[in-house]
Amino acid sequence: MAITQERKNEIISEYKVHETDTGSPEVQIAVLTEEITSLNEHLRVHKKDHHSRRGLLKMVGKRRNLLTYLRNKDVTRYRELIKKLGLRR
């Protein structure tokens, strides 16, 4: 269900803006997207796991807020990230 630390480090190294970056919107959105994908797979198998479904909805909301922030701050970075992650926005 949760992503491993190794996978998280791979995502951070792929989406980081500068060398010591771990908290930029791009990194946060990419990590949340990976967690959302993982949780979606879990919920396909365990349809009645409503506690995890609530966590999924919270993650989706957090990602939506970060995407809105990034779009308002820098549209080109936003569009590049959407394209790279394959999100439908």
Swiss-Prot record:
Gene Ontology annotations of biological process type: translation
Keyword RNA-binding tagged: yes
Keywords tagged on the record: Ribonucleoprotein, Ribosomal protein, RNA-binding, rRNA-binding
Superkingdom in the source lineage: Bacteria
Gene Ontology CC annotation, any one: cytosolic small ribosomal subunit
SMART domains: Ribosomal_S15
CDD domains named among the record's database cross-references: Ribosomal_S15p_S13e
Keyword match Signal: no
Entries under InterPro entries matching the protein: Ribosomal_uS15, Ribosomal_uS15_bac-type, uS15_NS1_RNA-bd_sf
GO-annotated molecular function: rRNA binding; structural constituent of ribosome
Quaternary structure and partners: Part of the 30S ribosomal subunit. Forms a bridge to the 50S subunit in the 70S ribosome, contacting the 23S rRNA.
Function: One of the primary rRNA binding proteins, it binds directly to 16S rRNA where it helps nucleate assembly of the platform of the 30S subunit by binding and bridging several RNA helices of the 16S rRNA. Forms an intersubunit bridge (bridge B4) with the 23S rRNA of the 50S subunit in the ribosome.
Family, similarity comment: Belongs to the universal ribosomal protein uS15 family.
Name of the protein: Small ribosomal subunit protein uS15
